[in-house]
């Protein structure tokens, strides 16, 4: 007798990774999943519904969910038949730029969505998972949760917070047969990333000194665009990594999705002092930009695999 489909609640499904993941799970050939695809603004649901096709209303339903609102979370969960078996914390927002030009309100918004939004959802589904002694919490983190990136101070901090919180929680939840998986993409070529880079390239960043603005506009932004061109993944590859994690009988705590990006994260892991990563990145960006360009060209030459192999 076939097992009942698992209910998967996904936040942030209006575009990008969340949308692609919801559609792929809903079209699972074995029909292992009943997907609740959520977004803050239901006015943006048309793209998701069109991509879902015949799965809409069958293995996929669309619901409103604002991860920054207790009331919205409670309302969403009350409309789900049964319990949430798999929670995918995908909703997120970015913030890039010189620190002096960023408001505290903007920084708090990032943490409210990226960190506290994820915590709010976990608190809501955890009692049911503990009672049933089973469940899987998947968190879409980032390689920026492993290493800081220049001019991404606040975004990286929100991802570092996720990594520490969920690694700590994983120890307790293993006793309840509940697994936590932190999925850590590198650069992903999505509408989210494209809009963010376009917006910051036009921003004024008041209160920032001219030298820092020069570094941001003339060094960081061109290097960031080249990084996306060289090692950026498409959402489908990242989604496949997430699907592999969800379908695993023994889900990993961490899963990086981009093999081409791994040399950059290795710089931090091989040196416990942290100096190797900071000094190498500083040297490449500020002193040897030609060497940085050469390295990015090497990563993009096509001799390294980019797709995630099923496990």
UniProtKB/Swiss-Prot annotation:
Binding annotation for substrate: 142
Tissue and organ distribution: Detected in photoreceptor outer segments in the retina (at protein level).
Membrane topology: Multi-pass membrane protein
Active site, renumbered: 155
MF annotations from Gene Ontology: all-trans-retinol dehydrogenase (NAD+) activity; all-trans-retinol dehydrogenase (NADP+) activity; estradiol 17-beta-dehydrogenase [NAD(P)+] activity
Keyword Calcium in record: no
GO biological process: estrogen biosynthetic process; retinol metabolic process; steroid biosynthetic process; visual perception
GO cellular component: cytosol; plasma membrane
Residues annotated as transmembrane: 86-106, 137-157, 169-189
Residues at which NADP(+) binds: 9-18
EC number: 1.1.1.300
Catalytic activity: all-trans-retinol + NADP(+) = all-trans-retinal + NADPH + H(+)
Enzyme class: oxidoreductase
InterPro entries from the UniProt entry: 17beta_DH, NAD(P)-bd_dom_sf, Sc_DH/Rdtase_CS, SDR_fam
Location in the cell: Membrane
Keywords: Lipid metabolism, Membrane, NADP, Oxidoreductase, Sensory transduction, Transmembrane, Transmembrane helix, Vision
Flavoprotein as UniProt keyword: no
Gene3D superfamilies recorded: NAD(P)-binding Rossmann-like Domain
Family: Belongs to the short-chain dehydrogenases/reductases (SDR) family.
Matches recorded under PANTHER family: RETINOL DEHYDROGENASE 8 (PTHR43391:SF8), RETINOL DEHYDROGENASE-RELATED (PTHR43391)
Functional note: Retinol dehydrogenase with a clear preference for NADP. Converts all-trans-retinal to all-trans-retinol. May play a role in the regeneration of visual pigment at high light intensity.
Name the UniProt record assigns to this protein: Retinol dehydrogenase 8
Organism annotation: Homo sapiens (Human)
This protein's encoding gene: RDH8
């Amino acid at each position: 007798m076939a097992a009942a489909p698992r209910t998967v609640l996904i936040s942030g499904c209006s575009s990008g990774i969340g949308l692609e993941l919801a559609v792929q799970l809903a079209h699972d050939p074995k029909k292992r999943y009943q997907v609740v695809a959520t977004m803050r603004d239901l006015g943006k649901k048309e793209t998701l519904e069109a991509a879902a096709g015949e799965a809409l209303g069958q293995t996929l339903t669309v619901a409103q969910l604002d991860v920054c609102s207790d009331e919205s979370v409670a309302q969403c969960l009350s409309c789900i038949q049964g319990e949430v078996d798999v929670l995918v914390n995908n909703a997120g927002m970015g913030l890039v730029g010189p620190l002096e030009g960023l408001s505290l309100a903007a920084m708090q918004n990032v943490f409210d969505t990226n960190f506290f939004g994820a915590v709010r959802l976990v608190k809501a589904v955890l009692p049911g998972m503990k009672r049933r002694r089973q469940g899987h919490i998947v968190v879409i983190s980032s390689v920026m949760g492993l290493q800081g990136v220049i001019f991404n101070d606040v975004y990286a901090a929100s991802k570092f917070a996720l990594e520490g919180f969920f690694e700590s929680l994983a120890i307790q939840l293993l006793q309840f047969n509940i697994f936590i998986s932190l999925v850590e993409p590198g650069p992903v070529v999505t509408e989210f990333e494209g809009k963010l880079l376009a917006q910051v390239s036009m921003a004024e960043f008041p209160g920032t000194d001219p030298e820092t603005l020069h570094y941001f506009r003339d060094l960081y932004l061109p290097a960031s665009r080249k990084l996306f061109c060289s090692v950026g993944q498409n959402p489908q590859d990242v989604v496949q990594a997430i699907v592999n994690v969800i379908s695993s009988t023994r889900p990993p705590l961490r899963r990086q999705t981009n093999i081409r990006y791994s040399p950059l994260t290795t710089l931090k892991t091989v040196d416990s002092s942290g100096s190797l990563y900071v000094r190498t990145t500083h040297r490449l960006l500020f002193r040897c930009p030609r060497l940085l360009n050469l390295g990015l060209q090497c990563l993009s030459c096509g001799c390294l695999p980019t797709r995630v192999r099923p496990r």
